Structure formats: structure tokens, C-alpha cells
Amino acid sequence: MVRVIYSKEFEQDVKKVRDKAVKERMIKQVEKILKNPEIGKPLRYNLKGERSVYVSPYRLVYALVDDKIFLLRFRHRDDVYE
């Protein structure tokens, strides 16, 4: 069974989002990730090993390690990769 681990940075990012519709879409994307962990776009360069899914207008960045999914960041697409 896959285990989900939330980073502190991810939790802080989610708290900043006030739009409930965005949070609901984010939850649906997390459910999709649980069903198929490789659904996200693989990232490159210094973010190699991480994946990203789009939750308009945000990006959810996560990493899959063994049977664990680490939710790393949930930020606006303009500054998520900084």
C-alpha cells in the first residue's frame, strides 16, 4: 500500500490557498496520483526524481520513493520550481 507524506512546505503552501475549488481539485489530483503514481510529468535537472501535475493555476510537485509518495510543493506555476 502506498503511503502519503506531506512536507512542511507543502502544508504551508496549501494553507495559503483560499479558493476551496482549487483545494478540491488538488485532492482529486492526489487521489489520481495514489491510483497511478507515475501520472505526473517527470521533472529534469535539479528536480530530477520529482514529478508535477497541473491543478489550474497551481502545480503539485511530488516524489515517489519505494511505496511512499512525498507531496513536496503546491504553488502557482510561475514560482513553483524556484
Feature roles, as predicted:
Residues M1-Q12, K16, K20-E24, V55-R59, ...:
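Enriched for short, Lys/Arg-rich terminal
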Residues S7-F10, K28-Q29, E38:
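A short alpha-helix capping/helix-coil boundary motif
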Residues K23, I27-E31:
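Short, well-structured alpha-helical segments
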Residues V30-Y54:
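A short, surface-exposed loop/turn module that caps and links secondary-structure elements
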